[in-house]
Design a protein with these regions (language model features):
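N-terminal signal peptide c-region/cleavage motif recognized by signal peptidases
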Residues: 15-19
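Cleavable N-terminal signal peptides
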Residues: 9-10, 20
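Histidine-/acidic- and/or cysteine-rich, low-complexity loops and terminal segments associated
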Residues: 21-136
Length: 136
């Protein structure tokens, strides 16, 4: 009986240890900064440990001026991105295609008027509108 009790505790301890191992939280990141005349430039960073192809990002009513092929930099595939919009990104939609349950996307936009926007896209909410009024 004594050995059975030890065995049960060891078995339960090992089972709990295996269950508590989690996947590393390593989200994709979109970082943009506003330039003159509705231009934005920044980085699209997608984790190298994600399953499948990198997710795609798109912007409503904006033209993509540049996006280089991704390069591995540390834990990320990094692409330089440049877009041109008729107006500010405020009030416009950003959409992601190809996010997974394990890969969310953090979005950070810095505007010329010193305001900024931070957002999160997930597989359940892959697109959102940047509000007209954003934080300082």
């Amino acid at each position: 009986m004594k050995y059975l009790t030890k065995f049960i505790f060891i078995f339960l301890g090992l089972s709990f240890a295996l269950l508590t191992q989690t996947h590393e939280m390593n989200p994709a990141r979109l970082s943009l900064e506003e330039g003159a005349n509705g231009s934005y430039s920044g980085l699209w960073m997608f984790p190298t440990n994600a399953v499948g192809l990198p997710a795609e990002v798109s912007f409503t009513n904006c033209n993509e001026e540049k996006r280089n092929l991704p390069e591995v930099q540390g834990k990320y595939l990094v692409s330089n991105i440049a877009i041109n919009c008729d107006e500010s990104l405020k009030g416009k939609e950003i959409a992601f295609k190809g996010l997974t349950r394990l890969t969310d996307a953090l979005v950070s936009v810095k505007f010329l008027d010193q305001t900024s926007f931070e957002g999160l896209a997930t597989i359940n909410t892959p697109k959102f509108d940047i509000p007209q009024e954003v934080s300082i």
